[in-house]
Amino acid sequence: MRNMIPQDNENPPQQGEANQNDSVAFEDVAVNFTPDEWALLDPSQKNLYREVMQETLRNLASIEVLWKRDSLKVKVISMEKF
């Protein structure tokens, strides 16, 4: 999979591709089942679903921490210029 953040010598992302300013929420990547669909899953499928959703939530949370840290660095650097 290619890097989704364009480098200076690359073209910007095309329609449907991500760029560094796109935001992602848990709801964007979560899989939701209706009660009827959930009832059709066996216990191992339900456990797999829970594990995948928990991992997705952890991944998004870690990205948020990195984003906040990087945003803070940019603010500090900007303030140092004054």
From Swiss-Prot:
Please give the InterPro entries that the UniProt record associates with this protein. Answer: KRAB, KRAB_dom_sf, Krueppel_C2H2_ZnF
Could you tell me which residue ranges the KRAB domain spans? 24-82
UniProt xrefs under SMART domains:
KRAB
Per UniProt, the ranges with Polar residues bias are 1-23
Q: Where is this region: Disordered?
A: 1-25
What Gene Ontology cellular component terms go with this record? Answer: nucleus
A GO biological process held by the record:
regulation of DNA-templated transcription
According to the lineage, what is the superkingdom? Eukaryota
Tell me the SUPFAM superfamilies matching this sequence. KRAB domain (Kruppel-associated box) (SSF109640)
PROSITE patterns, per the entry: KRAB (PS50805)
The identity of this protein, by name, is: Putative KRAB domain-containing protein ZNF788
